[in-house]
């Protein structure tokens, strides 16, 4: 999702500068994948290294932090607006429950609003879009297909 910064996506967990034993500075950035096995992790890591190198930091280490796992709740408001402007439906709040989960025989989450016309009448086309973190929907009002970033 090139319209988002790693910070706006919520995967950038932290950046710190440490001094090595030889007296040099190294930037250590921590990122969390949106999904286990996220195919964008290598690209995100490479982008971070290149951006920090371009900013004058020749030594960069990128660490993967898996705990706590990423949540779509971590997407910033600026990131959600960027998703909508790019024609994607931003996720709603992630479900956070503990204990027994009731059996649901209908849809497991409410259908998202269309990012183009705003209609609440949309239909799930496919559980998976171009990546596992997105689903495909069609608006029954304007008939446009769109991707929805899943609530995790």
Residue ranges and their predicted role:
Residues 1-152:
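Domain-level signature for proteins that mediate thiol-based redox and metal-cofactor handling
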């Amino acid at each position: 999702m090139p319209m988002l910064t790693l910070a706006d996506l919520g995967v950038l967990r932290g950046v710190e500068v440490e001094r090595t034993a030889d007296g040099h500075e190294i930037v250590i950035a921590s990122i969390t994948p949106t999904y286990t096995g996220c195919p964008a992790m290598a690209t995100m890591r490479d982008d971070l290294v290149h951006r920090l190198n371009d900013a004058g930091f020749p030594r960069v280490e990128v660490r993967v932090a898996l705990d706590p796992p990423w949540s779509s709740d971590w997407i910033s408001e600026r990131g959600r607006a960027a998703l909508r402007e790019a024609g994607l439906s931003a996720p709603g709040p992630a479900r956070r429950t503990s204990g027994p989960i009731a059996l649901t025989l209908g849809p497991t989450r409410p259908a998202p609003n269309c990012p183009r016309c705003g209609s609440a009448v949309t239909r799930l086309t496919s559980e998976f879009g171009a990546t596992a973190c997105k689903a495909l929907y069609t608006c029954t009002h304007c008939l446009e297909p769109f991707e929805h970033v899943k609530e995790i």
